[in-house]
Amino acid sequence: MKLPLLAFFILLLSSGAGAQTVDALGTFTPYSLFGIGEIEKQGSAMNIGMGGIGVAVRNNRFINYLNPASITERDTLSFMMDVGMDIKNFYNKDNDVSSAYNAFNMRNIVITLPIYKKSALILGFVPISNIGYKFASPETDPLIVSKYGDIKYYKYGSGSVNKLFVGGALNIGKKLAVGVELIDYFGTLYKHSDVEFSSDNTIRTIVSGNDYTISAFSAKFGAQFFTPFANDKYLLTLGATYSIGRDLGGDITDYSYATDATGISVDTLYHNVNSNNTIKMPGELAVGFTIKRQNKWMVGMDYTYQAWKSTSFPPVRGVDFEATASHSLKVGVEYTPNMYDVRYYFKRVTYRAGGYYEKSYMKVNGKNLSAYGITLGCSLPISRLNNALNLAVDLGERGSLKDNMVRERYVQFIINVNIHDLWFIKPKYD
């Protein structure tokens, strides 16, 4: 039976347009049904506040982990740590059905340390993608209903793909920095499809699912070329990164079993474990530039390409889905009135704004899924040195009300705490 993507989109816990808090889900969107789910926007609140740029960002106050080469821009005696989280509100609409939900997610934990002069070490944890959806649709064919009784089809999923990484970077001469990261991808994706039969006051369910265990290693390379101009008043930075594509490995567990009215399994239809997980994370190429006046303002742009068309995902019953190449274009700006002002606090605040356009790796019902949005952000200085509270908001939209698709509007609030301390000062006296 072929169904529209979100026909009768109904949260299992509730229906209608009331907002719901989704516990333990890093996202809540019907589009996470496909592939490895919703790809998370990378970067801290500093990056997201500028539309997500970071490939050519060099900042000695905050950690920019979008390009491993950027961590050489730092105080050589400093320890830096960045911890972030976000909350995202989704408003989904499909013809006459609408729903609103909230999802909370840990965003990043990243630490950088100096090694020797203009070289540094970085380690961290970052979510790559999230799955979170719950919806249902009833059987509407009168012949099937008359023969088998009322039938409901449920789809629900959860899980995430994450990465642990450790990297290093160094300056080569006065105008070039290079860096490399070693990456460990890990996580589990759960996708379930249930069929519930109701007849003669008896409810029976056939529960089917696919559990994907992710385990793979990869690497990311980065470089930044930076040169002053206009009598050293401004700095131009060109950046590039490349992540190696990898099979995500791990096991796939396929299962199906029948339950009685109490939900207890009464018959296992099949249970297979396959170690040949063919899901692939394709290579990613990103380039960008920034122009800045130190401690005053910066403007920049990033472009990212990822060849998802070369990977394959299990089909989704009733939906025409295929993977395609993804593209994104991001622009951003930041401005600090006077970071050394001792009288007016808000002159020391850094203000940010940006925008983006993304063509997702998902092609649904023959149509490319695109998103666009605007972002705002700021850095609020805390205490001494460069400790700060970084805030950002992302307002965007993707999908449409045409071609049996879903229009999704979202607001994402991001908060990062930046810790900056001097750990490696030699004492003057014994």
What are these regions (language model features)?
Residues 20-430:
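Subset of outer-membrane beta-barrel
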Residues 4-13:
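Sec-dependent N-terminal signal peptides
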